[in-house]
Every structure is written in C-alpha cells, then in structure tokens.
C-alpha cells in the first residue's frame, strides 16, 4: 500500500502530542513493507516554536529516533497534489487548515483514485462542534475518530458506518519501561497546560495529591503561563 499522511508536523511535537503516535504508526507501516510519505507545511507553528525555544538542535532527537521517517514540505496545494496522486490511501489530520481539507475533498470528488480519510484526534466535535463544522468533508470516504464518544458524534452527523475508532497509543518501540530495575523516586508529569482546559483536573488529581504525600514532582511541557507556573510553585513542582 502507498500511504500519504497529511499532518500539521511530523518533525515537531511542540504542543503537538499527536506527532508521537503518528511517528510510531508510520514507522510500523514502513517495517511491514508499505510505502509511506508524510506531508506538512513548510513552516508549521509547532516547528517554529520548537526552534524558537531550542534552536535547530531541537529537531535532532526526532531525526535520531526515527531515521527512516521523513516528511515532504509544501507551500501550496499544487506542491501537495502531484505526489499524492499516486497514493492508495490519504489520511488528513484535523490540525490542518480548513482550505486544505476542503481542497483534498474536492480532488477526491473529481476522481482521485485514493481512499481519503479524515483523522480526528481532538475533542472539539464534542466541546466546540462549530469549530469542526468549518471543515468541508464532502468527498471524504470516512473518518478515523480517536474514541467511541467522538465516533458517535460523527455518526449523528450522518457518517454512519464510515466512522472507525482508532485509539491513540504510545509507540512502545521508543517509549517503554527501563529494561533493568533502577532506583525510582518521585513523580514525573509530561504534558502541556492546555489553555486552562484541564487546570482544575491537574490541581485535583496531580498537584494536590503529590503535595499531600510529600512526593517530589517534576513537570515537563510547554505553554505554562505565569498563573500556571505560580500554581506549580505553590505545590513545589
């Protein structure tokens, strides 16, 4: 199978946790003998912010961990259209711009030979349905939804049996427990603040419990505003 995956970025995971899942899936497909190409904008905001924070060296860990992966960059639809024309399947992630999602749908309606799927890994269809309705999915063959609740929303929107649940998971070839027993101390949280969408949950289920039992807490992530950093300081995190 020849697969084209159109993503916001494969190179950067800055506030883009889907990149970890996508890298693992694409590498696994390559290992099984499929031809895989990823496509991303020339200057996605995730890459821009990663380089701003860490310089070009910030891109090195991805290249070292996934030497078999590469992504083609594009400036406009014409640069994307020709290479995709030979694909058997094209998957379009929902972090792409609405104009691009619509353009690929039009191409499929006009006879493009590939199967075209929309990949939704966010909760906006539930929490902010109008944001998802901005995407013109006319011409798409189906939807990949990251959970059953999200899939049910698409079924109500008329997608019926053309919705498939595709849970995200860790790439265990890279993320796994230590092979040998080591001394472990404290608690580590890896994640972003999330524009206050989960600040109450972090306070209730992470910060307070860790402080209550005196457990050292290390946090890794981006987009922690001043208020969030003050909350972490109060909990000695």
Locate the predicted segments by residue.
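Conserved catalytic-core segment of nucleotide-activated headgroup transferases in glycan assembly
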Residues: 171-237
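Carbohydrate-associated surface elements
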Residues: 149, 166-169
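A short, glycine/small-residue-rich beta-strand->loop->alpha-helix junction that serves as a flexible
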Residues: 9-21, 196-200
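Nucleotide-activated donor-dependent transferases that construct or modify glycoconjugates
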Residues: 1-15, 42
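Short amphipathic alpha-helix
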Residues: 18-29, 204-206
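Extended catalytic core of nucleotide-activated donor transferases of GT-like folds
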Residues: 9, 23-24, 37-154
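Active-site regions of enzymes building and remodeling cell-envelope glycoconjugates
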Residues: 53-57, 140, 160-163, 229-237
